[in-house]
Amino acid sequence: MMTRLAISGYRSLRDIRVPIGALNVVTGANGSGKSSLYRALRLLADIAQGRIIQSLASEGGLQSTLWAGPEAFSRAMKAGAQPVQGLVRKNPVSLKLGFSGTDYGYAIDLGLPLPDSLSKFSSDPEIKVESLWTGERLGRANAFAIRNGPSVRIRNDNGEWRQAYQHLASVDSMMTHCSDPRDGIELLMLRERMRDWRFYDHLRTDREAPSRRPQIGTYTPVLASDGSDLAAAVQTIREIGDAEEMDAAIADAFPGAHIEVTSSDGYFELEMYQHGLLRPLSAAELSDGTLRYLLLVAALLSPRPPALMILNEPETSLHPDLLPPLARLIAQASKRSQMVLVSHALTLVAALDAEADSRQIALEKQLGETILRDGTPPDWTWPSR
């Protein structure tokens, strides 16, 4: 389980270290940095998919995503006695992402490429350093894999360092190119775990949402990120998952209601039966809030729960009366998967805060920098270039 998250140089996250528990609720005012924290987790997941450079490019490139303030704030700047201004840099420009847990830790350092007038890709960032270690904090004795520039070394079963790569491209991660079942088994295991992280921030409920139409019926243990295969996901839960928990979650939010999946010529369609109505309502007839709740039920009750699930503002379109049932559903899901939830809804935050394993991560801005409002940041060591 992840216990520490560290981000440096990414948007408003100049240098933040966050303690992570089983159920984490990220809160804060608009512009406090919640979305940046969410995006940073997405970038970490993209490393395992080999997409980190492309993902940064889609955000406008490294220059657009880097922290826009000074490298550090002086005491006078923080006290307001001196205007905020840039100083001579002591360290190279970098964007760093990392996390650690009870078993493994990983960190990456991306920076600017050397000037090359012949290349049209000079704005692409380069991977300067990567490191994989055991435990929560990087040290000399617990590192398993180290990447410096194009060189990658991996520690074998005898504790000896082996040269795994000498010419790894600056846009390729050792996570995707150096993991093998022999000496790179730790890289392989962590890569597959990161690939399993699940993000939900764009569950569509608009009139043209695919979940409102009949869908091809096929085994679906994991709901798509946009919810397009809702009917198939619901039927999969009913056949191989916890159908009783799904029915209870529906009844908790809509007393007297239940859902069924109909099949015709290989296509599935979701129907909802509500107390007092003479016929079921199809997904096309459901309100945005009702459909969104059903999508969240299908996501949270997946028969194949991920190691980590991240929900971005799940309360969107939901009536306040649905937030307590949603909180109970999320709390149950956190017993199967580690959860990170970004939310504005005070009712949802308060309901989740009452859970025994819940940890509230309150963010705020100070001189444009995102900081933790409460608590002591965990210890963290970045690998050096």
Kindly give the residue locations of the regions a language model identified.
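Phosphate-binding glycine-rich loops of NTP-binding sites
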Residues: 22-64, 293-297, 347-350
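Conserved ABC ATPase signature
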Residues: 229, 235, 239, 244, ...
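Electropositive, glycine-dotted interaction segments
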Residues: 94-240, 244
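Phosphate-binding P-loop
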Residues: 15-21, 301-304
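Catalytic acidic motif of RecA-like/P-loop NTPases
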Residues: 11, 24, 42, 287, ...
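C-terminal lobe/lid and adjacent interdomain/linker elements of RecA-like ASCE P-loop ATPase modules
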Residues: 324-385
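N-terminal pre-Walker A segment at the start of P-loop NTPase domains
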Residues: 1-14
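Conserved P-loop NTP-binding catalytic core
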Residues: 39-115
